[in-house]
Each structure stands twice: as structure tokens, then as C-alpha cells.
From Swiss-Prot:
<dbReference type="InterPro" id="IPR017441">
    <property type="entry name" value="Protein_kinase_ATP_BS"/>
</dbReference>
<keyword id="KW-0812">Transmembrane</keyword>
<protein>
    <recommendedName>
        <fullName>Ephrin type-A receptor 4-B</fullName>
        <ecNumber>2.7.10.1</ecNumber>
    </recommendedName>
</protein>
<feature type="binding site">
    <location>
        <position position="652"/>
    </location>
    <ligand>
        <name>ATP</name>
    </ligand>
</feature>
<dbReference type="GO" id="GO:0007411">
    <property type="term" value="P:axon guidance"/>
</dbReference>
<feature type="active site" description="Proton acceptor">
    <location>
        <position position="745"/>
    </location>
</feature>
<feature type="modified residue" description="Phosphotyrosine; by autocatalysis">
    <location>
        <position position="601"/>
    </location>
</feature>
<dbReference type="InterPro" id="IPR003961">
    <property type="entry name" value="FN3_dom"/>
</dbReference>
<keyword id="KW-0808">Transferase</keyword>
<dbReference type="InterPro" id="IPR011009">
    <property type="entry name" value="Kinase-like_dom_sf"/>
</dbReference>
<dbReference type="InterPro" id="IPR034270">
    <property type="entry name" value="EphA4_rcpt_lig-bd"/>
</dbReference>
<dbReference type="Pfam" id="PF14575">
    <property type="entry name" value="EphA2_TM"/>
</dbReference>
<comment type="similarity">
    <text>Belongs to the protein kinase superfamily. Tyr protein kinase family. Ephrin receptor subfamily.</text>
</comment>
<dbReference type="InterPro" id="IPR008266">
    <property type="entry name" value="Tyr_kinase_AS"/>
</dbReference>
<dbReference type="InterPro" id="IPR001245">
    <property type="entry name" value="Ser-Thr/Tyr_kinase_cat_dom"/>
</dbReference>
<feature type="transmembrane region" description="Helical">
    <location>
        <begin position="548"/>
        <end position="569"/>
    </location>
</feature>
<keyword id="KW-0524">Neurogenesis</keyword>
Length: 985
């Protein structure tokens, strides 16, 4: 019976092979390690037992090529254990391999008398080994891969109809670690024929993506792993971003990242980089493709990165490679002169040929010549040009302060961006003129010869340029306090004058000007002198001892009076305060820079030109929008000014469709910022006004606004770090105060923080009008600003001073120490105003040092003259930083007993009837037993509790102690108010 079965299986196998064998093409992602059909001659695999088990059979395919197969069909006997082992298979670096088995299997039901012994499955095993010296099959060494079952089995009918049912099964094996392995097939009683066995591993084949080549890569050790592979740029290309891809377990490349770019002089073609053709160029690797040489240039070789200019044509250093080559301009045309005494006006027409460039400008050369017009020399610095001498964009200029009756030659040169590269070309036109008689120049000095009680005798030198015969001098004088509203004139033919009829001990301002036949010159600058108090000449040589003694005695008395007044004023406040009236008088010390309000300029654009640097828009690269401001978008980007390194900047843009007023208001902030130069004031890089959009360029602050930054980093900084931030803000505000600038909107949201935690004051563009609505804030063009940062006198009377900025600084201190908490929490603006008016102030934030909260309270003094100056604030913060121990003491106690503290966690006294009510309202019910056990059964006892008491009754958490004590303080304050014992500040 067994022989019959073997014969049936063999005949069926022969017919099958004729249909399925032949040359096969495998996917590129599969690398074959073993293919039984490609072996020439016998396979020679080891079988166990050697006889009566697996049998090697050779059959012919349709091309009469022998194919070696193995078959077994011991279905008549039970307990079969027939093993077949392949030769040693090297794994070739693969960590996971795949076994493809093609086989046929006889249906047990089609064989009579084998129901108890016939099987329809077989087992697949593997064994790893570093060599091929295994001669025997040691079953215990092998690891089972799987039990293989047929999807289809054949019967006797199929054999008769020559229908053979071939099964294909694939199993993966791994991870593998040794040099190679064996496969083994275990038959347990099936009628089976192994038609072919193929072992392979998968790889991601060599490929080129985004100009990067990725090599053949073997897949990972498991079916879900991804192998990261770094690509290498193809020839003549460079990395833009590191090229990477992932090799999937199925041999497919996934997720391409990064790319390469063809080098300058090369462009992409069919997955590679080819050189630019003759007549074409590519300047940068980031350019997409080669471009044809621009006009007046050529490229004679392949792979050019730029084109050479034709003879006589040039390219400026700042010109892009895509710009046509250009020439210097021809000379200006039609130069016309107009002489007006010692001034000359010149006008001309543009050059006939601009050289092909739009950047034509004009330089003016002035020469003073002798009578024969042969000996000429430069005019010197005394001559003035309007609008300027060099870099003129207009075709007219005025030359002033020339000498009278003098010959001058003026040359007008036309230049453009390539003029320096061809200095030999004549680009100028000239004209010679003779000036007329002119008025004299300004008197530069006035000196007092004698000063008495009612008169001043003056003398002065002749003007530097008389420009003719001086006919007379005119002296204008007035009292200092009159500011030229009422003045008198005295005329004299000499260089001196006696001014009489003056008031004693009064300051007078004097101006002098000279007159010739051509008219009056300009008045001199102001010179101030004060009359005496006693009828005597100036103290000097020849003064009597008596007069000298009286003068000295009077001076001593005056000094004593001033010292006494100073001491009295010092006693009024520990901060050396002086009563600040509604209109504060600004004392401008010599050498101290003072803020100039740009809105006082008749032409606001003049303020922008004076205080802000104009930047070429081509130097700016906008990268992304980071916010929306009052006038348009706020962006981040880069600024690269020629000759300087590239820096990150913030860019404010003016939205399209703006009005003249909006443009003026937008640029006013730049006019203000441009006057400031301090490490704690936001730095203005410049403006763009000559093209759209109009932009303000400032330094870039990486960490954004201080309030948001603190909220994002709640609790991460030490007290010293927070005080350092406050010190920086205070230093910036001291600088502004010293310049007589009042900020008006100092708040944490208007402080910017850079990557080094340096805080800088910003937002100088606000104009505010206080509305009558108590719930309103200062109305601006972009919205409303909450009044909870604003001093009470500024709210009530619009009194904005440095002292009101100090109040705002105190609120900023509170914001910093509370990590960006909203001042006064969710109270309405009307309630805030009312509470402040009644003497209430913000309590110390959690863990805030007492010294810092005391400084806050000093900043919040109702009388603005009692508040510290910014210089004193900075000095105090410096002392705290130098003495860190002074910052360790925290608590809720307060030396100002008449200042009630606000606390949102304190329940209303009227709503609390017992200790339990208070604990529930304050969310501290967990400590009910602690208070009860310690004997705190009434609210009258609770309001006297302190930190030691809380520790004693078992409440040890510092944060819980602070919050409970804060609530107790609020309860105590409300109780005092109800009993009439508290007097608001």
C-alpha cells in the first residue's frame, strides 16, 4: 500500500512541475540565500532516519531541466518522526529571514485505511550556528518556527484529471545573531512533497531621492522596525537639510526627510546635477535652475556661477548676479546758477544716460578761486549746503555762507553704484559765479564790562565775516522770565553799549547783531547777566573792603537760608521728596540728554529723520508673524546690514490703507525709541519709510512679554533672580526719568525679556485720553488699558509724572513676585479705584520678602511726593541683592498699621458666624480638628492667631500657613472696620 501511495505522489508531482517551474524573477527588495530549484545536481540534504523517511526525487520541468524535490508518504504507520535538514545557510548580515515553501499534500480522506495514522501538517524548525560542521540532526537544538498546514490538498480524482494543487507558505525567522543557520522539516505522518524551498531576506534597494543617494539597506530585526539611513548627496550637490529615509520591514523606503541642492553652477536633471550650459549661470545652490546671463554679460564655460560683464560695463558689490551689468552715468545737463548775495542756488537736468541704473545721485564740489580764476582751493567747512553736499537725490541745491565778492567754481558730479569702478569717465558739469555783497555774520561773544544795580555795560568783538563796512549794531534785551514776549532795542555805532533803567537783582538776556549796506545779520545767541542788589560795581579790582564785606555777608546769609530750606524739605520725607505741582518744572542740567517730544515738530517726518535710522528694505528678511499690533502685524526676522553681522529682529509693520495720521502715530514710537540708549530699554535698529510696508525694526526679545513669561515659568526662579529682573526694569525707568520722559503705561505686559533674562522697557507709542466712565481705562487707538496699574492722581486729574510711573512700578513689582498674577484679581475697576481711595493696598504675594513688599507700599503712597525716586529704588534693590539674607524674611506683618491689605481669599465677616464657617469659606475644613483641639472655638480668638500658633497646632506646611494667615489678616481688617478702629490712609 505504501508503494502505491509513493507512486501516486510522484506522478502527481511530475505533472505539477511541468506547470509551475521555470525561471523566476524575484522583487528587488528580496535577496535570496537559498533556492532549491537553482541547485545543480543533488541537494544532498540530511534526512533522519536515513531510510524510509524523506526521499530526494528528481523530476523534469517543461524545458527538461531536472528539479530536485523531497517527498515523504508514510501514512500507513503511526508515530512518524521523519526529519529533513538543509545545508548550512549563511545569513549575510540579515537579522530576519523569510522561508518560502511550495509543497503538495495528499488529502487523508482520499486514502483508504489510514484515518488513524495519516496527518495533513508538518513542522518547520531552525537552528543557528556559526559554522557548517553539523553532520547530524540533534532535534533538541532546533527551535520550532511553525506548524505548516496546506490550504489545499489533492485527491485521487485530481491525479486522474491531472489537476495538482500547489501550496505556498511563507514564514519569517528572527532575530538572528550567528553567522548562519539550518532549516529542518519534521514529518509526523503526512503524504507531502516539497517542490521548492527558498530562503531570502528583505532590503530596501539603492535609490535616489531629493538628490540624495541611499544605499542598499537590510531591514530591521522585527516586522515593525524602521531603520534610519542617512543619504549622501549626489555628485555636484550639497546638503540643505540632512537627507534621511527609513527602511521599512517590507523593503520599502519611507518618510523622506531633508534634501540636497545642486551646487552653484549646476542644476537638477534626471535625478542628478548637470553643469549650466554656456551662456547660463547659477549663483547660489538655493536657486532653482540655471538662468540665462543678464544683459551686457556672458559666460564662456559650463558650470558658471556668475556672468562676466561686457567691456565698459560693471556690477556693484551689492548687485545680485541676476541684475544686468551697468555703466556710470553721463554728466548732468543744463546746469543753471542763481546768485543771491552770498548764497548760490544751482539747478540741473539728469544725465542723458543713467548707465542703466536707478540709483543715480549727485555730489557737489565747491572751489574758491582767485580773481584770475586759475588758483582755486576747496571751500572748507564754513560753507553750508541744503539739503546736503553729497548723495543728493534731487537736481537742485542751495549753497550758503559764502564770502562776499568772491569767485566760486561749482562742479556737479553724477554718480551711481558703479562709478567707483570706472573713475576715468568724465561725469561732471561745472559753473563759475561771483558772489555779491552780503549781511555780516553772527556776533559770537558778548562780555559784561560793568554791572550795577540798574545798568549793564556790554562789549563784543566784530563779526568774523563783516562782508562790508559795518554801519551799526543792534542790542535786543529782555527780562529772563519774559521769554522775548516783551523786549527793547538799543542801537550803537561802536562795539559796546550801556543798558540802563534795569531792575535790581533781575536776570536779563541780551542779543547783538550787526548791519551793513546789505542789511542786518542774524542775532547772536542769548547771553544772560543779572543786576546787583547794592549800588556798587562788579566785585573786582579796585572794589572797597566795605563793599566786599557786605557782599560776602549777604552771600553767607543767602547760603544759610538755602541750607535751612533744604533741611526742612528733607525732613518731610525719607526719600528727599519735593512737592510736585501740577505743572512740574524740568531743570535741564548741562550735559544731560533730554527727551524731545516728536509731536512738537511742525513736520513729524523731520523727527523720524532726526532720531531714527533709515534701513534699506532689502536688508530685512521677514520670517514669521508672531502677533498683531495696533497698526498691523508684528513679525520676527533677520537684519543684515552690509559690513555687520546678521541679527534677529522684531518687525512692526503698518497695515495697508493707512491714513496720514495713522502713519504719523505709528512712526512716533520710533521717534521716541530712537532717543533712548540704555541696556534696559528696547533698542531701535531703524525704520523703513521709503517703501511699503512701513516698518519699525527693533531688537528681538526671545522670551516675549514679562507677564506671560512669568506665568509660563511659575515658581522656577529664585528671589534673587526676580529682584534682578526688577532691578533691570528700575534702571531703565531711572534712565527715562532722568531724560524727563514719562512712560504712562508701565506694566509687566510692556516689559520684554530676552534669552538672558534681561528685562527691557518697551511700548512708547501710546496716546491716552481718560474717559469719564469709572469702569473705563485709558482709551488708545487700539483698545483700552486697565487702570489698575495707574496712580490715583493720574486717574482723577490726568497728572502723569515720574511719580505716577513709580506707582506703576510698584504694581510691576507685585506682578513679578506673584509670577504674573492679575493685580486686584477679578475686582472691577470701579472697586479698585474705591479701595485705593480708602487706603487699601495689595497684600504681599506668597513667599514675598517683607523688604520688597515694603518697597511696593512706598511706591503706592497716596501723596506722590512721598514716593521714592527711581534712583532710590535702584539703590535699594542693589542693597538687597548685596545682602541676600534680607530677602529671606517673609510674612504678612506690616509696619504700616493704617494700610489695610486686600486679600481675595478672605471671606466677608458678615457671612461668617463660626470658626467652622470660616474654615469652609476659606477651603481649610481639613484643619477643623486642629483648631478645635487647640481651643480656637470663636472667631475673636482666631483673628489673633500667628505663625507660631499654627505650627503648634500641627499646621506645618509653609504655603498653607501663609494662606491661612492671609485670610486671618483679612478677617482682622474687616473686624477693625466694623468696630471703627481702622483709619484709612
Amino acid at each position: 500500500m505504501a508503494g502505491i501511495v509513493h507512486g501516486i505522489l510522484f506522478c502527481g508531482l511530475f505533472g505539477l512541475c511541468w506547470a509551475v517551474t521555470g525561471s523566476r524573477i524575484y522583487p528587488a527588495s528580496e535577496v535570496t540565500l537559498l533556492d532549491s530549484r537553482s541547485v545543480q545536481g543533488e541537494l544532498g540534504w540530511i534526512a533522519s532516519p536515513l531510510e524510509g523517511g524523506w526521499e530526494e526525487v528528481s523530476i523534469m520541468d517543461e524545458k527538461n531541466t531536472p528539479i530536485r524535490t523531497y517527498q515523504v508518504c508514510n501514512v500507513m504507520e503511526s508515530s512518524q518522526n521523519n526529519w529533513l535538514r538543509t545545508d548550512w545557510i549563511p545569513r549575510s548580515g540579515a537579522q530576519r529571514v523569510y522561508v518560502e515553501i511550495k509543497f503538495t499534500l495528499r488529502d487523508c480522506n482520499s486514502l483508504p485505511g489510514v484515518m488513524g495514522t495519516c496527518k495533513e501538517t508538518f513542522n518547520l524548525y531552525y537552528y543557528e550556528s556559526n559554522n557548517d560542521k553539523e553532520r547530524f540532526i540533534r532535534e533538541t537544538q532546533y527551535v520550532k518556527i511553525d506548524t505548516i498546514a496546506a490550504d489545499e490538498s489533492f485527491t485521487q480524482v485530481d491525479i486522474g484529471d491531472r489537476i495538482m494543487k500547489l501550496n505556498t507558505e511563507v514564514r519569517d525567522v528572527g532575530p538572528l545573531s550567528k553567522k548562519g543557520f539550518y532549516l529542518a522539516f519534521q514529518d509526523v505522518g503526512a503524504c507531502i512533497a516539497l517542490v521548492s524551498v527558498r530562503v531570502f531576506y528583505k532590503k530596501c534597494p539603492l535609490t535616489v531621492r531629493n538628490l540624495a543617494q541611499f544605499p542598499d539597506t537590510i531591514t530591521g530585526s522585527d516586522t515593525s522596525s524602521l531603520v534610519e539611513v542617512r543619504g549622501s548627496c549626489v555628485d555636484n550637490s550639497e546638503e540643505k537639510d540632512v537627507p534621511k529615509m527609513y527602511c521599512g520591514a517590507d523593503g520599502e523606503w519611507l518618510v523622506p526627510i531633508g534634501n540636497c541642492l545642486c551646487n552653484a553652477g549646476f542644476e537638477e536633471h534626471n535625478g542628478g546635477c548637470q553643469a549650466c550650459k554656456v551662456g547660463y549661470y547659477k549663483a547660489l545652490s538655493t536657486d532653482a535652475a540655471c538662468s540665462k546671463c543678464p544683459p551686457h554679460s556672458y559666460a564662456l564655460r559650463e558650470g558658471s556661477t556668475s556672468c562676466t560683464c561686457d567691456r565698459g560695463y560693471f556690477r556693484a558689490d551689492t548687485d545680485p548676479a541676476s541684475m544686468p551689468c551697468t555703466r556710470p552715468p553721463s554728466a548732468p545737463q543744463n546746469l543753471i546758477s542763481n546768485v543771491n548775495e552770498t548764497s548760490v542756488n544751482l539747478e540741473w537736468s539728469p544725465p542723458q544716460n543713467s548707465g542703466g541704473r536707478p540709483d543715480v545721485s549727485y555730489n557737489l564740489v565747491c572751489k574758491r578761486c582767485g580773481s584770475d580764476l586759475t588758483r582755486c582751493s576747496p571751500c572748507g567747512s564754513g560753507v553750508h549746503y541744503s539739503p546736503q553736499q553729497n548723495g543728493l537725490k534731487t537736481t537742485k541745491v542751495s549753497i550758503n555762507d559764502l564770502q562776499a565778492h568772491t569767485n566760486y567754481t561749482f562742479e556737479v558730479w553724477a554718480i551711481n553704484g558703479v562709478s567707483k569702478q570706472n573713475p576715468e569717465q568724465d561725469q561732471a558739469v561745472s559753473v563759475t559765479v561771483t558772489t555779491n555783497q552780503a549781511a555780516p555774520s553772527t556776533v559770537t561773544q558778548i562780555q559784561p564790562k560793568e554791572i550795577t544795580r540798574h545798568s549793564v555795560s556790554l562789549t563784543w568783538p566784530e563779526p568774523e565775516r563783516a562782508n562790508g563796512v559795518i554801519l551799526e549794531y543792534e542790542v535786543k534785551y529782555y527780562e529772563k522770565d519774559q521769554n522775548e514776549r516783551s523786549y527793547r532795542i538799543v542801537k550803537t555805532a561802536s562795539r559796546s553799549a550801556d543798558i540802563k533803567g534795569l531792575n535790581p537783582l533781575t536776570g536779563y538776556v541780551f542779543h547783538v547783531r550787526a548791519r551793513t549796506a546789505a542789511g542786518y545779520g542774524e542775532f547772536s545767541g542769548p547771553f544772560e547777566f543779572t543786576t546787583n542788589t547794592v549800588p556798587s560795581p562788579m566785585i573786582g579790582e579796585g572794589t572797597s573792603p566795605t563793599v566786599l564785606l557786605v557782599s560776602v555777608a549777604g552771600s553767607i546769609v543767602l547760603v544759610v537760608i538755602l541750607i535751612a530750606a533744604f533741611v526742612i524739605s528733607r525732613r518731610r520725607s525719607k526719600y528727599s521728596k519735593a512737592k510736585q505741582e501740577a505743572d512740574e518744572e524740568k531743570h535741564l542740567n548741562q550735559g544731560v540728554k533730554t527727551y524731545v517730544d516728536p509731536f512738537t515738530y511742525e513736520d513729524p517726518n523731520q523727527a523720524v529723520r532726526e532720531f531714527a535710522k533709515e534701513i534699506d528694505a532689502s536688508c530685512i528678511k521677514i520670517e514669521k508673524v508672531i502677533g498683531v499690533g495696533e497698526f498691523g502685524e508684528v513679525c520676527s526676522g533677520r537684519l543684515k546690514v552690509p559690513g555687520k553681522r546678521e541679527i534677529y529682529v522684531a518687525i512692526k509693520t503698518l497695515k495697508a490703507g493707512y491714513t496720514d495720521k495713522q502713519r504719523r502715530d505709528f512712526l512716533s514710537e520710533a521717534s521716541i525709541m530712537g532717543q533712548f540708549d540704555h541696556p534696559n530699554i528696547i533698542h531701535l535698529e531703524g525704520v523703513v519709510t521709503k517703501c511699503k510696508p512701513v516698518m519699525i525694526i527693533t531688537e528681538y526679545m526671545e522670551n516675549g512679554s514679562l507677564d506671560a513669561f512669568l506665568r509660563k515659568n511659575d515658581g522656577r526662579f529664585t528671589v534673587i533672580q526676580l529682584v534682578g529682573m526688577l532691578r533691570g526694569i528700575g534702571s531703565g525707568m531711572k534712565y527715562l526719568s532722568d531724560m524727563s520722559y514719562v512712560h504712562r503705561d508701565l506694566a509687566a505686559r510692556n516689559i520684554l525679556v530676552n534669552s538672558n533674562l534681561v528685562c527691557k522697557v518697551s511700548d512708547f507709542g501710546m496716546s491716552r485720553v481718560l474717559e469719564d466712565d469709572p469702569e473705563a481705562a485709558y482709551t488708545t487707538r487700539g483698545g483700552k488699558i486697565p487702570i489698575r496699574w495707574t496712580a490715583p492722581e493720574a486717574i482723577a486729574y490726568r497728572k502723569f509724572t515720574s511719580a505716577s510711573d513709580v506707582w506703576s512700578y510698584g504694581i510691576v513689582m507685585w506682578e513679578v513676585m506673584s509670577y504674573g498674577e492679575r493685580p486686584y484679581w477679578d475686582m472691577s475697576n470701579q472697586d479698585v479705584i474705591k479701595a485705593i481711595e480708602e487706603g487699601y493696598r495689595l497684600p504681599p504675594p506668597m513667599d514675598c520678602p517683607i523688604a520688597l513688599h515694603q518697597l511696593m507700599l512706598d511706591c503706592w503712597q497716596k501723596d506722590r511726593s512721598d514716593r521714592p525716586k527711581f534712583g532710590q529704588i535702584v539703590s535699594m534693590l542693589d542693597k538687597l541683592i548685596r545682602n541676600p539674607n534680607s530677602l529671606k524674611r517673609t510674612g504678612l506683618e506690616n509696619s504700616r498699621t493704617n494700610t489695610a491689605l486686600l486679600d481675595p481669599s478672605s471671606p466677608e465677616w458678615s457671612q461668617v458666624a463660626s470658626v467652622l464657617d470660616w474654615l469652609q469659606a476659606s477651603k481649610w475644613k481639613r484643619y477643623k480638628d486642629n483648631f478645635t483641639a487647640a481651643g480656637y472655638t470663636s472667631l475673636e480668638a482666631v483673628v489673633h492667631v500667628n505663625q507660631d500658633d499654627l505650627t503648634r497646632i500641627g499646621i506645618s506646611s509653609p504655603s498653607h500657613q501663609n494662606k491661612i494667615l492671609s485670610s486671618v489678616q483679612g478677617m482682622r481688617t474687616q473686624l477693625q472696620q466694623m468696630q471703627g478702629r481702622m483709619v484709612p490712609v
